[in-house]
């Protein structure tokens, strides 16, 4: 699966290249949202209560309904730019995981292979980002985003599985989702309502270090792997 640092670096790349003019708070909320599922242990139990495999809560099969729920919230909007950005970051995290080989049921159940693949994907993602090789795409507004993700996931699992296939679909899918649901701020300074919502989401409480890193595009993430 993708490491937390890879989620952070990809979401930061999207902010730097698609929404460089957004406020630091809005960008930080998005980037923190993109790593929050990895540091929230409860998310790994998604699906377990229904008798499915334990600690597979980030797997595509277990997270499909939750992604659809997040999508509906984002489509409805009206929640302020900080909360919108945070939830969008969470959706981007799960979308990226959906196109990661070990997060699909077709991956062989072998811990050694899982760890080896994680390292290989981490190196591949770093190499691609360092060489500025990131697909930033969009789709027509009339296309249903949930149906589109299901369609490209079907195509994804039918192709040769590996780091290249993962990365190509991950970067396409997360940029499409971000472009669809990004909410442009009407003013450059976040409102008090947005700040209050950020506090409600525990953004500055549970990840003040991560937030500082997320808000500084030039800082390498530390302590997150």
Describe the residue ranges of each PLM region.
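N-terminal leader/auxiliary helical segments
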Residues: 1-90, 95-225
């Amino acid at each position: 699966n993708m490491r937390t640092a890879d989620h952070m670096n990809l979401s930061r790349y999207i902010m730097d290249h698609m929404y460089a003019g957004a406020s630091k708070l809005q960008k930080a909320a998005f980037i923190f949202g993109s790593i929050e599922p990895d540091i929230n242990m409860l998310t790994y139990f998604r699906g377990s209560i229904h008798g499915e495999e334990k600690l597979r809560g980030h797997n595509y099969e277990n997270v499909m309904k939750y992604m659809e729920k997040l999508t509906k919230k984002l489509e409805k909007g009206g929640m302020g730019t900080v909360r919108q950005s945070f939830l969008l970051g969470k959706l981007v995290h799960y979308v990226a995981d959906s196109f990661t080989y070990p997060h699909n049921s077709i991956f062989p159940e072998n811990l050694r292979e899982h760890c080896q693949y994680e390292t290989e994907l981490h190196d591949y993602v770093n190499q691609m980002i360092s060489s500025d090789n990131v697909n930033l795409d969009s789709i027509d507004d009339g296309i249903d985003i949930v149906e589109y993700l299901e369609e490209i996931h079907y195509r994804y699992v039918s192709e040769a599985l590996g780091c290249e296939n993962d990365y190509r679909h991950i970067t396409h899918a997360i940029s499409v989702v971000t472009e669809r649901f990004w909410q442009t701020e009407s003013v450059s300074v976040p409102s008090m309502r947005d700040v209050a919502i950020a506090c409600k989401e525990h953004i500055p409480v549970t990840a003040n270090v991560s937030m500082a890193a997320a808000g500084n595009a030039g800082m390498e993430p530390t302590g997150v792997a």
